[in-house]
Each structure stands twice: as structure tokens, then as C-alpha cells.
């Protein structure tokens, strides 16, 4: 349409498997019957609430992936003559990941249920689920990079991708 343009995929540090672009509106004429009014704004907010459930779900998946990657690394890497998995601080870090995963999952399920009941869901519960899940994902992605050591920042490492994607997830879709 006249006055609407779109960019090619943005060169982002994260979510590289899901290209994002921009829409630009310049001097676009909107017919009076097509303008976003109160009912349309409500629908738009329901869309944002759905995006928050989506972000919370991603956060849960990222935490679970961090747990999986760290368990494999801890069982296969040795330090001080023993597997990392025998070192109490590593056990504690992975245990905290598992605890936050369960909390994030249950909060996300409650938020999803509220959305499924209609009327756009409980916006406070949806925001809590998004905030907790994405913050926990970031926190545990940082821990995963630490557990991996130098390999954690190498491009071939899965945890470096979790780190990049978790940061973006905190920013997307607001709170």
C-alpha cells in the first residue's frame, strides 16, 4: 500500500533463526472505519498478552536447554581429577536451574490457562510469567556459559546461543 515499506531482515545478535524486519508508515491514509479505536486497542493488547505467554514459554525452553547442556558438560568434563558433576557448586547451580525451571513452567501454565479462558487473560499474571521466565532464562544462560568455561563463549557452543537469545527475550514483548 502507499506509504508502507518494509525492511529486509535486521542483523540482530539473537534469534537468528527467526528473521525480524521493520514496517515503516509514512503519510499513510487510514479510512475512518479502519482506525484503531478502543475495541481495536483491546484486541491489540490481547495480542501482546499472547506474545507474553509465548515469551514465557521460550524462557522455559531456554532454561530446560541450559539444564540439559550443563548436565552433559558436567558429566563429561573433569576438573581436579573428577567430573564437574561431583563438584558441589556445579550441583547447586544445576539444582537452582531445575528449581527455576519448575517455577517458570508452572507460572507459564497458569498464565496460559488464564489466556485460554478468554478476554485476553490476566494481564498481571501474564506479565509475571514473562518476567520470571525470561529473567530466569538469562540468569541460567549466564551460569551455563560459566560452567562451560572458555567453550561457553565459542560460536560452536549451544550455550552462547542461549545467552544471546535469552537477552533478547527479556526485551521483546515488554513486561
Language-model segments: what does each one mean?
Residues 57, 88-98, 127-130, 135, ...:
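Extended, low-aromatic, Leu/Ala- and acidic/polar-enriched alpha-helical coiled-coil segments
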Residues 136-144:
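Hydrophobic alpha-helical segments of membrane proteins
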Residues 71-85, 98-132, 145-153:
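C-terminal helix-coil-helix/basic helical segment that borders enzyme active sites and/or dimer interfaces
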Residues 1-68, 72, 82:
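FAD-binding core of flavoproteins
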Residues 148-175:
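Glycine-rich phosphate/cofactor-binding loops in nucleotide/flavin-utilizing enzymes
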